Amino acid sequence: MINIRPDEISSIIREQIEKYDQDVKVDNIGTVLQVGDGIARVYGLDQVMSGELLEFEDKTIGIALNLENDNVGVVLMGTGRQILEGSTVKATGRIAQIPVGDEFLGRVVSPLGVAIDGKGEIVTSDSRLLEAMAPGIISRKSVCEPLQTGITSIDAMIPIGRGQRELIIGDRQTGKTSIAVDTIINQQTEDVICVYVGVGQKASTIAQVVNVLEEKNAMSYTIVVASSANDPATLQYIAPYAGAALAEYFMYKGKATLIVYDDLTKQAVAYRQMSLLLRRPPGREAYPGDVFYLHSRLLERAAKLSDKLGGGSMTALPIIETQASDVSAYIPTNVISITDGQIFLSNDLFNSGIRPAINVGISVSRVGSAAQTKAMKKVAGKLKLELAQFAELEAFSQFASDLDEATQKQLARGTRLREVLKQPQNSPLSVAQQVALIYTGINGYLDDLPVSNVKSYCASLMTYLTTSKKPYTEIVRTTNQFTEEAESSLKEAILESKEAFSKTN
């Protein structure tokens, strides 16, 4: 008979108990009740958070938006064609995030951070929440540095500062995207990281923007986030937040960033579609009640950070499309009230050949003037008033037959100033060039030239300033001030180039 030793058995059992490691994994799992139109109703997800990512059986990802008594309303980030009624859904425990990093520069990505430009996968270790909190009051600093757009009429009359939110608003086909793209191109020498977000655009339009940026060597400091018109509404809704997260990554590293949302009208339409399908009560123009918050929480993320946080900035240029120039519609008035000013583009001006077609009368920048360079402030101080008076006089002069000499002079100068401010697409100007053009126009040096010759003379003046080695350009470029020396140098250049121009024309 075997001699059993109880103490040995008990020590073996004790050892086994100590070694026993039960790895319990608890998954929050639900069942699909109904699916269709990019929306799924899920039963059984009791522990789910608002905004949490959910994974379906076919690996489609969804976001939990509606938390109701007996089910959860989920918006799908895909077609959802493989999702069946009764299939299981797993809560991931994660809120929507996007990978971020320097590796994204020069790339075209989807709102989920996946490369769609055929240049290979983007590998990065950092990520940021799509819906990050905007910087608080203490974290901010007032706007104090200029963001040069390279467009004379904007930099002179509607100046934009780093950390500002300036709305670009106008009807379709009035040059809204062109202004934004020109601003990105102009950042080549400014050390500004740019993010272009295309929301609900045609794929061909986004490709065109990318081609222009590549031609102008601007893609090296630009990220394009693209959600085209055939993407699900969910992707169009999150695209601006994805762009903001990418820009924030650079902003918190102390860099200056510029983000363009093209355009927020389409994001609002996508959000309306999702909300109506989720059976949320509709409000004005069938938009849900929180459509203001949709845009305010996005645009509040643009800021000029305090020196303690690195002094980075994020300048936002949201674009809104109006119908028949109606700026009093719901979405335009919402975004106008959130932003720090607006650039209004007029259909009539565009069709009459004035491009960029900026309506100076109702365009305004509420904080940018504090950031305007001293050189520009000194020269362009009277420009906006002069053009506003000219527009008024021009309207009255259509009814009056005989005008006094002073009025005729003012009309003649206004016409020439308007010519000076016309600018071809994708050809931004430096501050020194802009100051020279405005100085020439506002001080009457163009009054004796025929209107048809103004553009060609301005081009010859720019060439003369570049080739004649006048100290003017260097003074303005290095000091950002229009000193007496710079002024006398510019006067000489104007008179000399005018003399040469009159001989050839």
From Swiss-Prot:
Q: Residues at site: Required for activity? A: S363
The membrane-topology field of this record reads: Peripheral membrane protein
Give an example GO molecular function. Answer: ADP binding
- Asked if tRNA processing is a keyword of the record, the answer is no
Return the EC number.
7.1.2.2
* Primary localisation category: plastid
The chemistry this enzyme catalyses reads: ATP + H2O + 4 H(+)(in) = ADP + phosphate + 5 H(+)(out)
Q: What does this protein do?
A: Produces ATP from ADP in the presence of a proton gradient across the membrane. The alpha chain is a regulatory subunit.
Q: Which PANTHER family match?
A: ATP SYNTHASE SUBUNIT ALPHA, MITOCHONDRIAL
Q: Whom does it interact with, and what assembly results?
A: F-type ATPases have 2 components, CF(1) - the catalytic core - and CF(0) - the membrane proton channel. CF(1) has five subunits: alpha(3), beta(3), gamma(1), delta(1), epsilon(1). CF(0) has four main subunits: a, b, b' and c.
Q: What is this protein called?
A: ATP synthase subunit alpha, chloroplastic
Give the source species.
Phaeodactylum tricornutum (strain CCAP 1055/1)
Task: Give me the gene this protein comes from.
Answer: atpA
